[in-house]
Amino acid sequence: MDVHFYEAFEEEIAMLRQHLPAQVHAHFTSDTIQESGDTEPPAELISIRTQSVIPPAWTGKVSGVVSRTTGYDHLVGCRIPCGYLPHYCSHAVAEQAILLVMALLRKLPAQIAQFPAFHRDGLTGGECAGKKLLVVGVGNIGTEIVKIAQALGMQVHGVDLVEKHASISYVTLDDGLAWADIIICAMNLTKENVAYFSYETLKRARKGVVFVNVARGEFTPTEDMVMLLDESHLGGLALDVYENESKLAVALRSGQSGFPLLGRPNVILTPHNAFNTAEAVDRKARQTIQQIEYFIAHKWFLWPVP
């Protein structure tokens, strides 16, 4: 079977090639479907990440779509059989979330900027131990965040529709916002919770709160984040995901600038890279091949999109 991989980066391609079975003929590109300009599907089975949009005209021409992602909101409504990878990167994303928290607490961007003058004024940061962390969305990733945070001595509360972990103290969103020093968004995206962390919502949080989003960019409207920073309501902001991310990624890759969150000393922006460890990329490659082999045998996916 021919499989075409979109949005594949160098290390990922190397891992996939290691695990490809003989009956799979693979083609790779770093482009999204839209960047590639493909008007017809290049293979019977295609694989994407979050920034490609499946053209409606490909329905009936493609047998299946494998998304190499833990989320699947970008596939909701697709009329082609779709699979995803729910388990490959939970710990990797959780580690990055805590990494971003630490970097903001210790004012790492300012530390780096002030090294050339070896200047320490204004660089006094904070420690994790004793801080109050609210994890919104206590699923696979959120659970790992809680484990790491508790090991660091943080006080942790969770917000979730399903309170399934006896070891986690759950609160309402409003109670959590009023309590937390730090908020991490690890939710699943649905059509009901777009813009969940709006200006109005985060204004109910304590002034100076640190906010991190490693889930989906649709939760955090860019204009709202700008206003909260300009008003000094957010003490720090870290994003790995972005509103209108597919358009933003294309603009940045083509050299366009002007993203309003760039260049702020209390903001850290990473290119949707929280999943990207050698261990997670290897798991992703193995599980992608599992999906493909299962699809060849059963015309369905081992982990289908619900």
Give residue spans per PLM region.
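Rossmann-like dinucleotide/phosphate-binding beta-alpha-beta segment
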Residues: 123-207
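Short acidic low-complexity segments
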Residues: 29-42, 56, 165-179
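Short glycine-/small-residue-rich Rossmann-like dinucleotide-binding loops
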Residues: 50-51, 70, 187-189, 215-216, ...
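N-terminal glycine-/charge-rich "phosphate-binding" loop or analogous flexible N-terminal tail
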Residues: 1-43
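Phosphate/diphosphate ligand-binding glycine-rich loop within oxidoreductases
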Residues: 41-112, 126, 211
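Beta-strand-loop-alpha-helix segment that lines the small-molecule cofactor/substrate pocket
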Residues: 59-65, 75-82, 185, 189-231
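Rossmann-like dinucleotide-binding domain for NAD(H)/NADP(H)
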Residues: 208, 216-306
